[in-house]
Amino acid sequence: ITIVDCSDYPKPVCSLEYMPLCGSDSKTYSNKCDFCNAVVDSNGTLTLSHFGKC
């Protein structure tokens, strides 16, 4: 299982860095910050499927 540490999130602004991650919702997030903000918004129900585009 691949895990991303989202303990420092949410953040108000994410960088434009592009390092895509695929969430368990089959959505591609542009970077860890975008993904972790979504994880926080989902109350932890969203998980990482894999690194890279979905």
Curated annotation (Swiss-Prot):
It comes from the Eukaryota. Avian ovomucoid consists of three homologous, tandem Kazal family inhibitory domains. The keyword Glycoprotein applies. PROSITE patterns: KAZAL_1, KAZAL_2. Signal peptide: none annotated. The keyword Secreted applies. CDD domains: KAZAL_FS. Gene3D superfamilies: 3.30.60.30. One of its GO terms (cellular component) is extracellular region. The record marks 16-17 as: Reactive bond 3. It is found in: Secreted. Disulfide bonds join 6-36, 14-33, 22-54. Keywords: Disulfide bond, Glycoprotein, Protease inhibitor, Repeat, Secreted, Serine protease inhibitor. Glycans are attached at residue 43. This is Ovomucoid. GO terms for molecular function: serine-type endopeptidase inhibitor activity. InterPro entries: Bifunctional_prot_inhibitor, Kazal_dom, Kazal_dom_sf, Prot_inh_Kazal-m.
